[in-house]
């Protein structure tokens, strides 16, 4: 039996999100629908998730003393990491002391850097991955480039949403890619991974939910990226039954190895019926924003249900759907959004404005979502809606 309380009272179940971006915002909303009291922690004020939370704290989550202080102050029932830049050693200690880290402190630690999860997937679980080498210095990086070969992909071991990531297509890109990897990652200069370029037909995100009743999968999500940063996604990604079965097998094996309950975003390359593991995050995935319109239970609702121990008897898809991001390309400390009415003129269309208080150059500020007759139609509808929105700087 699962008993839920009432926020703001002695019966409240308390959830603390470590990180408060647009994905965390949707998690907060879903948790509050079930009476959960939500606290958001991030490194700056007025993040999207803070705008809908009961309370918030501004700290560096890499500061072990500060992280421990806010956890011990609030004594949450669930600690839910949402970003990479967290003192994971402190989470391991807190878990040993009885706090519930979602999905587990070990899973959080392994997936917060690409080295931990790549070694788990390739060396322990036995999943096929691209050839890779790690490097701490430019000399090691140049040696790794020689061994892996060109073309290759360069990523900081601690980053997300394409930050610090680039593709080396020729010798002319080598120095630039190193410099960007050291300036663009979540935690500044540091260790990187050099990956061989993978020959694939398409890439998917397979949202995988570990819950009280077992493991469930959403329909596969296809997506398009620019320099590692998501721009469009669609669901379902057409694929053969054999390829889907292989993808689900990979997702099951890696999420079982990580353990705990919650939603995982498993990224896979598909070549014919062959599957190559890319990455996994133990939390909602940006490409999964499409599920806000495509499914009866969005990825955020699934995550919250799994965390709370609630049943997930089925995941129903409404039909082909797509998302298209709303991007800034200017500087503002108070961006506004014009023509939202035009974006929403078509039926089966939604617009989410994330609530990011400032932009300086290219930044995701929102997303348009649409259902369609098929995936191609849904993508066209989503792009029309996102293109209709004009950002005022």
From Swiss-Prot:
* Pathway recorded for this protein: Purine metabolism; IMP biosynthesis via de novo pathway; N(2)-formyl-N(1)-(5-phospho-D-ribosyl)glycinamide from N(1)-(5-phospho-D-ribosyl)glycinamide (formate route): step 1/1
Residues annotated to bind ATP:
114, 155, 160-165, 195-198, 203
Q: Where does N(1)-(5-phospho-beta-D-ribosyl)glycinamide bind?
A: 22-23, 82, 286, 356, 363-364
Domain (ATP-grasp): residue spans on this chain: 119-308
Note the subunit structure: Homodimer.
* Role played: Involved in the de novo purine biosynthesis. Catalyzes the transfer of formate to 5-phospho-ribosyl-glycinamide (GAR), producing 5-phospho-ribosyl-N-formylglycinamide (FGAR). Formate is provided by PurU via hydrolysis of 10-formyl-tetrahydrofolate.
Name the chain's protein. Formate-dependent phosphoribosylglycinamide formyltransferase
Naturally occurring in which organism (per UniProt): Maridesulfovibrio salexigens (strain ATCC 14822 / DSM 2638 / NCIMB 8403 / VKM B-1763) (Desulfovibrio salexigens)
Q: Which gene encodes it?
A: purT
């Amino acid at each position: 039996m699962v008993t839920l309380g009432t926020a703001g009272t002695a019966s409240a179940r308390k959830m603390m999100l470590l990180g408060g971006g647009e994905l965390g915002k949707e998690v907060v909303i879903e948790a509050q629908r079930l009476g959960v009291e939500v606290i958001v922690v991030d490194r700056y004020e007025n993040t999207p998730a803070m705008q809908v939370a009961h309370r918030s704290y501004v700290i560096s989550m890499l500061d072990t003393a500060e992280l421990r202080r806010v956890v011990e102050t609030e004594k949450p029932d669930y600690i839910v990491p949402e970003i990479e830049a967290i003192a994971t050693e402190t989470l391991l200690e807190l878990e040993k002391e009885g706090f519930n880290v979602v999905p587990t402190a070990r899973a959080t630690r392994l997936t917060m850097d690409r080295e931990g999860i790549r070694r788990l997937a390739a060396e322990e679980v036995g999943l096929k991955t691209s050839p890779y080498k790690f490097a701490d210095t430019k000399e090691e990086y140049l040696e790794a480039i020689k061994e892996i070969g060109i073309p290759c992909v360069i990523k900081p071991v601690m980053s997300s949403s394409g930050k610090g990531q680039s593709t080396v297509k020729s010798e002319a890109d080598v120095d630039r890619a190193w410099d960007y990897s050291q300036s663009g990652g979540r935690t500044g200069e540091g260790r990187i991974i050099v990956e061989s370029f993978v020959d694939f037909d398409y890439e998917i995100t397979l949202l995988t939910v570990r819950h009280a009743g077992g493991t469930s999968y959403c329909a596969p999500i296809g997506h398009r990226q620019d320099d590692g940063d998501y721009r469009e996604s669609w669901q379902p990604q057409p694929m053969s039954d054999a390829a889907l079965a292989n993808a689900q097998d990979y997702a099951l094996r890696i999420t079982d190895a990580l353990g705990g309950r919650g939603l995982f975003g498993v990224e896979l390359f598909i070549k014919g019926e062959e599957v190559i593991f890319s990455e996994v995050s133990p939390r909602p995935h940006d490409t999964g924003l499409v599920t806000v319109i495509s499914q009866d239970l969005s990825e955020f609702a699934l995550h919250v249900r799994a965390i709370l121990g609630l049943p997930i008897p089925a995941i129903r898809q409404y039909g082909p759907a797509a998302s298209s991001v709303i991007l800034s390309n200017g500087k503002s400390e108070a961006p506004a959004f014009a023509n939202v009415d035009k974006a929403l003129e078509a039926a089966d269309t939604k617009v989410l404005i994330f609530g990011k208080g400032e932009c300086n150059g290219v930044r995701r500020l929102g997303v348009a979502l649409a259902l369609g007759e098929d995936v191609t139609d849904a993508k066209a509808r989503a792009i029309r809606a996102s293109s209709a929105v004009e950002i005022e700087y």
